[in-house]
Amino acid sequence: EMPIFSEDRERESGHPAQAHAFLERIAGADALVIGYAEHNGSFSAAYKNIVDWASRVNRRVFQYKPTLMLATSPGAGGAASVLALAEKSAPSMGAELIRAVSVPSFHDHFDSGKGVMREGETASRLAAAVVDLEAAVEAARAAA
């Protein structure tokens, strides 16, 4: 289990192995798809903690990877508060933000029996975001 971040703990014990492993996984990825849970209008404690630790090892946690950010909720807000925070922090965290998509009223848009999004505007927005992410990955490969 990842310890809760604190500067005192960092001085005493250094950086946990999980933070290094997290950064290694990101380094090996062509792109990132990050799904945010909204807790009281902000990041979840688990997300905040891993990013706090990882940013002490590499300030640009997302390592300039093409990034698609997603958030959803059962209500009409679609976790828009946390998504706005994520978008605002993207440049300083080293994310090449391709798209950020909020999915409001999740249960209205997702068919849990089939495990798929229902057809409609929300599904179209998600599909377009994936196409844009794929294009960014291909462009990065071509430039390398």
Where do the PLM segments sit?
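Glycine-rich, flexible loop/turn motifs
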Residues: 1, 5, 58, 93-99, ...
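A glycine- and small-aliphatic-rich helix-loop capping segment at beta-alpha/alpha-beta transitions
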Residues: 49-59, 87-92
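Glycine-rich NAD(P)-binding loop of Rossmann-like domains
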Residues: 62-64, 112-117
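Short, glycine-/small-residue-rich phosphate/pyrophosphate-handling segment
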Residues: 63-107, 120-124
